[in-house]
Amino acid sequence: GVPCLCDSDGPSVRGNTLSGILWLAGCPSGWHNCKKHKPTIGWCCK
């Protein structure tokens, strides 16, 4: 997956660690969708 910004990472992608992973279909086991974006795209964070 592609790294994405979790809520716990901070308000901006600049200077922050991207601890989330962008998945196209849901989230892997042990992860949760941290943003309500599109139903087919999961902004997955631990």
UniProtKB/Swiss-Prot annotation:
SUPFAM superfamilies referenced in this protein's UniProt entry, alphabetically: Defensin-like
Subcellular location: Secreted; Nematocyst
Effect of P39G: In 50% of the molecules
Disulfide linkage: C4-C44, C6-C34, C27-C45
GO cellular component: extracellular region; nematocyst
GO molecular function: sodium channel regulator activity; toxin activity
GO BP field: regulation of signal transduction
Keyword annotations: Disulfide bond, Ion channel impairing toxin, Nematocyst, Neurotoxin, Secreted, Toxin, Voltage-gated sodium channel impairing toxin
Function recorded in the entry: Binds specifically to voltage-gated sodium channels (Nav), thereby delaying their inactivation during signal transduction. Thus it strongly stimulates mammalian cardiac muscle contraction.
Family (UniProt): Belongs to the sea anemone sodium channel inhibitory toxin family. Type I subfamily.
The protein's name in its UniProt record: Delta-actitoxin-Avd1d
